[in-house]
Regions:
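Bacterial N-terminal signal peptides
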Residues: 11-28
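Aromatic- and Gly/Pro-enriched helix-to-coil junctions and flexible linker segments
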Residues: 31-190, 195, 202, 208, ...
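Intrinsically disordered, low-complexity segments enriched in small/polar and acidic residues
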Residues: 145, 421, 430-433, 437-450, ...
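Extended, polar beta-sheet/loop recognition surfaces of beta-rich domains
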Residues: 73-93, 386-392, 415, 420-421, ...
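His-enriched metal-coordination microenvironments in redox/metal-binding proteins
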Residues: 149-417
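Acidic, Ser/Thr/Pro
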Residues: 204-208, 318, 419-435
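Short, charged low-complexity linker/loop segments at the C-terminal edge of domains
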Residues: 129-133, 276-279, 414-428
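N-terminal secretory signal peptides that target proteins for export/translocation
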Residues: 1-11
Length: 462
């Protein structure tokens, strides 16, 4: 299915948005059109182009497996959705972005809408969602280009034309009775396509659909619905050793029951650095998970904390908080060696449906001896509409109905390596990259031996 249905979109909206939305629909119909009221072409469209059309465009592209339910470049669709647009905006549901306003300007691809822009769009809806004259609109393609390259390239990949594309040998079949499943699967590399180690500059995961809860790979990082591609800063990269397979850990989550089986053909694309490029910083990642706690039944604000010491000078590239349905808020802080404390990331309203990677505009220096303080808050009460079971005592676990308290970071030591792409690769880096892939492959073998049913390996998905 190309587009998410309107019903599915409405199901995902908070109840307050729906109630206010339909009330707004009744009220907006009673508002008389005035000559001074904003119009779609003159007022709303430019703001949609600036803030929304990265997803909400004709034949909207998938961003991490999610497709927007309508195009906001089309007047008829925008008018139909106008009440929902207003309330998604005023409640902060859209544009989707978790980082607090205090972080404005710190992270790439941030999604904040200005107060005056919000007021204009609300006035457009309240004024009857008037069309206006198409001649009042500026050149659409020009505005989209100025908005930061929000049009999907002809290649179908946000990273442009990949140097390498891998996918499953055949679709993965997730049966009716499965709700959560975490197979570790190998994606074969096309013969002759990857015969020597390569430095990755860009990587994009294309989940087969919203039932893909996450994808983990040594070379691609972590992919979840709604998260875009990895594009490393100039001089930063990840080494992909030559190998006939790319091993990925998949986590599928869906409602079980008759007729719910799905087939998945997740893909991944890579762009490599050209020979002669200098790699100064080899990207490393740390999940920083924390377990050993239990969320009491009905607790609306359960807090979990953990610390992590920085043992060498590093540049912090990005942060990716991760919880499940009971996740409420998350904070990263750093305590410097002199005792000064700074908030690195504050996500006051965590949304399981939008799991962003917050990448700094410029990598942030953290000196050796600094201590990271991580805090997670969970809502296990009836007030949490996503809560699978408020009567359960919840612990850290792999199922989506369990919980997690992860604080993934991407970083690199500050010491420059000066590795020239195309020349010999330092032995320590090559050994580490090969070991990571081998460890993941061994876990795949262990999974094969322990799973009772691997019908998807042979079952016809037609």
């Amino acid at each position: 299915m190309k587009l998410i249905t309107r019903a599915l979109f409405l199901k995902a909206l908070p109840a307050s948005v729906l109630l206010t939305g339909f009330s707004s629909l009744l009220l907006s119909g009673a508002v008389s059109a005035q000559d001074s009221a904003p119009t779609f072409y003159a007022d709303a469209l430019p703001l949609f182009q600036k803030n929304c059309v990265a997803c909400h465009q004709p034949d909207g592209p998938k961003v991490g497996g999610i497709t927007a339910p309508m195009s906001l470049m089309d007047y008829d669709q925008a008018k139909l959705w106008a009440p929902m647009i207003k309330n998604a905006l005023i409640t902060g549901y859209m544009p989707p972005w978790g980082a607090h306003e205090r972080h404005r300007g710190e992270f790439k691809d941030e999604r904040y809408i200005e107060d005056n822009e919000l007021a204009t769009l609300v006035a457009w809806v309240d004024g009857g969602a008037l069309e206006g004259k198409p001649a009042d609109a500026a050149d659409q393609s020009g505005q989209i280009a100025e908005a930061g390259g929000t049009v999907l390239p002809d290649s179908g990949w946000w990273i442009g034309d990949p140097d390498l594309v891998v996918q499953f040998d055949r679709p993965v079949y997730v049966k009716d009775d499965i709700m959560d499943w975490q197979p570790t699967v190998q994606m074969p590399v096309p013969e002759g396509a990857h015969t020597e180690p390569k430095w990755v500059s860009k990587a994009e995961l294309a989940p087969g659909g919203p039932w893909v809860h996450h994808i983990v790979s040594s070379h691609m990082g972590v992919g979840v619905p709604g998260r875009g591609p990895f594009t490393y800063p100039e001089g930063w990269g990840v080494l992909m050793p030559e190998d006939p397979f790319i091993t990925v850990n998949m986590h599928y989550h869906k409602d079980p029951g008759e007729g719910t089986a799905i087939t998945d053909m997740t893909r991944a694309g890579f762009v490599f650095y050209e020979d002669g490029t200098v790699i100064d910083h080899v990207v490393e990642t740390n999940l920083l998970p924390h377990s050993g706690w239990t969320i009491p039944p009905g607790d609306p604000n359960f807090e979990v904390t953990n610390t992590h010491e920085i043992e060498e000078d590093i540049y912090l590239l990005s942060m990716g908080p991760h919880m499940h349905y009971r996740g409420k808020a998350m904070r990263y802080e750093v305590e410097y060696p002199d005792g000064e404390r700074e908030t690195l990331l504050w996500v006051p309203d965590y949304d399981f449906n939008w799991q962003f990677l917050y990448e700094y505009q410029e990598p942030k220096f953290l000196p050796a001896g600094s201590v990271m303080h991580m805090s997670w808050w969970f809502d296990n009460s009836t007030q949490n509409r996503w809560n699978p079971d408020y009567t359960a005592a919840v612990e850290y676990g792999p199922e989506t109905t369990d919980e997690m308290a992860n604080a993934r970071i991407y970083y690199a030591p500050t010491t420059k390596r000066g590795i020239v792409v195309g020349n010999d690769i330092p032995a320590d880096i090559l050994e580490t990259a090969r070991k990571e892939e081998q460890n993941r492959r061994e876990r795949a073998n262990l999974l094969d031996q322990s799973q009772d049913d691997f019908a998807w390996l042979t079952e016809d998905s037609d």
